[in-house]
Amino acid sequence: AQPLRASPAKAYLESRGILAASPALRFHPQTPLGPKGRTRFLPAMIAAVSLDEGPIAIHRTFLSGNSKADFDKPKRALGALGEAAVRLFAPASGKLGLAEGIESAMSAYALTGIPAWATLGNERFGLVSVPESVTELHLFVDHDAGGELAASRGLAAYARDGRTIHVR
């Protein structure tokens, strides 16, 4: 995979109003999709899904021009996610935000300046490992049933003495 600069992945993010860059995101013009013998090779934004020890899986957003590819489930993980997240920006001054998707986390960072990670699913709030050094956690959730689930899971899992949690 190559850096995002001047790639369809960068154009995809920019089409969504996302101008920030993260070293966790890359682009590959020929990303395999499908089983052996029926594999297609498509352009994709590639995201490292990481723990403290480093990457353990990847997340692929398949693209068509500067949009998500038009087929069922154009966003797919490869590998077991466990407690990992797409760590777009490192926590700073004890602050970290969690959002469901990469685009939401990037947008939250752009709007608030709070470093954010993508959990890769509302159901994964509470599963993602948050560093003990985080004293101010922001849960950037959608305002729907999935977001309510994410908020309740996050509040239950991440509460501890010395940590403030904000649902946004």
Language-model segments: residues:
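TOPRIM metal-binding catalytic domain and adjacent DNA-binding surface shared by DnaG-type primases
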Residues: A1-M45, S50-D52
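A residue-level signal for conserved active-site and pocket-lining positions in enzyme catalytic cores
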Residues: L13, A108, L139
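Short phosphate-binding/catalytic loops that engage adenosine nucleotides
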Residues: I18, G113-I114, G162-R163
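Phosphate-handling DNA/RNA-contact segment within nucleic-acid enzymes
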Residues: G34-E136
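Acidic beta-strand-to-loop metal/phosphate-binding motif
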Residues: L98, T135-G146, R168
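A structural preference for short, hydrophobic beta-strand core positions in alpha/beta folds
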Residues: A118, H166-V167
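Acidic, metal-coordinating catalytic cores used for nucleic-acid/nucleotide bond scission
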Residues: R124-G126, V141-A151
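Short, aromatic/basic amphipathic alpha-helical patches
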Residues: L149-D161
